């Protein structure tokens, strides 16, 4: 999960609140102290943290809970709202034809983000392409070309041409029929006069709808200075924060950018194209607090899965064969790493009320799922359609064919039976996602 350490610390503070006998001033002070510690360790500005802490204490003691909400839920709601205040709202990204100019310092992940951004829009049904206008950094052309080919997005570049403005003009002409045109500009080690001049010249010919500044989350609170400097020089409409998965200073970067009033547009949370998300503060904070993000999970499923992947009608009628389970495992694999999917589930399903799994346990579970697919590849069509056919002799045959032990085959059959029982429970109305979404935080 993004900023896992901060999320664990915040969830630990809320668990203390949930486990308290009664919500009094002492309990609130203890919880606030834990939240303070978590935010300061994430490099959030001290002044912001102290201001937020004071507001949580005052509101928790003075405000009456809204109708239908108990004191515990009310305090959690206050924490949620105050975190929203210091993180800020995301940028308004519309799915329509537009030109985007990428700016930022060298090493921020700008070129990679340009390709991932194109892929993001392409997944949303828009034709996207990139223009390689970074003529300053050796290798920038080849890097963007390779990434574009890998992600199957449009590309335009002129290897050896040192004129970034000319390349931009030619590139936008070449990508004229594309919905989304992204211009990757050069970075520097500092915001120098020649960089500003080049960006202004590119801006004049590109006439971009958006100028996104790319920042490395590892710089923490320094993000504020960079965002201010770029905004004053060329004006920015949004910020992309990269490498949020690999630093303890992500909270500092997020809150510092918010303080500049420059909206956060996207966040990079890993190496793959799927680890690039539109930033939505409410969803982000929900995941941090262990409340899940079912909306993002559903969107990810819609983008990744086809009707052939999951036969919803059959599942809801209680029909769940090994063939269905095989498709389900393949579908989960398309949606991304198991750990990332689990972080989107609310408390009691992987969040606050769930069991905390280590990286090793997630890996072991993923390996087991792959093993199950190997075992099922050694079964006949009849066996996949009706697991009751699989007796002792068939288990031995499947075991030999898959290279797995008979115990592994039996474990798979037991897992299938458990899943079948669980789905019958869902069918009976014990699991109502819509109801859960409406109840969540009373919002």
From Swiss-Prot:
It catalyses: GTP + H2O = GDP + phosphate + H(+). It holds the Pfam family SRP54_N. One of its GO terms (cellular component) is signal recognition particle. Keywords: Cytoplasm, GTP-binding, Hydrolase, Nucleotide-binding, Ribonucleoprotein, RNA-binding, Signal recognition particle. It comes from the Archaea. Its EC number is 3.6.5.4. PROSITE patterns: SRP54 (PS00300). The keyword Glycoprotein does not apply. It is found in: Cytoplasm. GTP binds at residues 104-111, 184-188, 242-245. One of its GO terms (molecular function) is GTPase activity. The keyword S-adenosyl-L-methionine does not apply. Its main location: cytoplasm. GO terms for biological process: SRP-dependent cotranslational protein targeting to membrane. CDD domains: SRP54_G (cd17875). Composed of three domains: the N-terminal N domain, which is responsible for interactions with the ribosome, the central G domain, which binds GTP, and the C-terminal M domain, which binds the RNA and the signal sequence of the RNC. Involved in targeting and insertion of nascent membrane proteins into the cytoplasmic membrane. Binds to the hydrophobic signal sequence of the ribosome-nascent chain (RNC) as it emerges from the ribosomes. The SRP-RNC complex is then targeted to the cytoplasmic membrane where it interacts with the SRP receptor FtsY. Belongs to the GTP-binding SRP family. SRP54 subfamily. Part of the signal recognition particle protein translocation system, which is composed of SRP and FtsY. Archaeal SRP consists of a 7S RNA molecule of 300 nucleotides and two protein subunits: SRP54 and SRP19. This is Signal recognition particle 54 kDa protein. It comes from Methanosarcina mazei (strain ATCC BAA-159 / DSM 3647 / Goe1 / Go1 / JCM 11833 / OCM 88). The lineage of its organism: Archaea, Methanobacteriati, Methanobacteriota, Stenosarchaea group, Methanomicrobia.
């Amino acid at each position: 999960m993004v900023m896992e350490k901060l999320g664990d610390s915040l969830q630990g503070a809320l668990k203390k609140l949930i486990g308290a006998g009664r919500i009094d001033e002492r309990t609130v002070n203890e919880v606030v102290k834990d939240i303070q510690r978590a935010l300061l360790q994430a490099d959030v500005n001290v002044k912001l943290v102290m201001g937020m802490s004071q507001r949580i204490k005052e509101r928790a003691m003075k405000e009456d809970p809204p109708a239908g909400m108990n004191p515990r839920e009310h305090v959690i709601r206050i924490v949620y709202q105050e975190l929203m205040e210091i993180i800020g709202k995301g940028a308004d990204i519309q799915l329509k034809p537009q030109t985007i100019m990428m700016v930022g310092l060298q090493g921020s992940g700008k070129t990679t983000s340009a390709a991932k951004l194109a892929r993001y829009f392409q997944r949303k049904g828009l034709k996207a392409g990139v223009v390689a206008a970074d003529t300053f950094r050796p290798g920038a052309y080849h890097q963007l070309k390779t990434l574009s080919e890998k992600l199957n997005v449009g590309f335009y570049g002129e290897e050896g041409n040192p004129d970034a403005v000319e390349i931009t003009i030619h590139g936008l002409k070449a990508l004229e029929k594309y919905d989304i045109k992204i211009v990757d500009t050069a970075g520097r080690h500092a915001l120098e006069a020649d960089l500003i001049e080049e960006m202004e010249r590119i801006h004049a010919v590109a006439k971009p709808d958006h100028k996104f500044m790319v920042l490395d989350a590892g710089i923490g609170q320094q993000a504020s200075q960079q965002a201010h400097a770029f905004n004053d020089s060329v004006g920015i409409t949004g910020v992309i924060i990269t490498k949020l998965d690999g630093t303890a200073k992500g909270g500092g970067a997020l809150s510092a950018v918010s303080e500049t009033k420059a909206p956060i547009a996207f966040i990079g949370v890993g190496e793959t194209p799927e680890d690039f998300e539109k930033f939505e503060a409410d969803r982000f904070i929900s995941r941090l607090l262990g409340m899940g993000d079912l909306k993002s999970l559903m969107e990810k499923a819609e983008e990744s899965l086809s009707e052939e992947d999951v036969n919803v009608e059959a599942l809801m009628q209680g029909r769940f064969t090994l063939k269905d389970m095989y498709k389900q495992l393949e579908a989960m694999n398309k949606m991304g790493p198991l750990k990332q999917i689990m972080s989107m589930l609310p408390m009691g399903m992987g969040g606050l009320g769930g069991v905390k799994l280590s990286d090793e346990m997630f890996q072991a579970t993923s390996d087991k799922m792959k093993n199950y697919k190997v075992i099922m590849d050694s079964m006949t069509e009849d066996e996949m359609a009706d697991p009751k056919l699989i007796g002792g002799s068939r288990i031995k045959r499947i075991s030999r064919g898959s290279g797995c032990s008979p115990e592994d085959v039996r474990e798979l059959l037991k897992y299938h039976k458990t899943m079948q029982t669980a789905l019958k429970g869902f069918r009976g109305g014990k699991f109502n996602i819509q109801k859960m979404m409406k109840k969540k935080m009373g919002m």
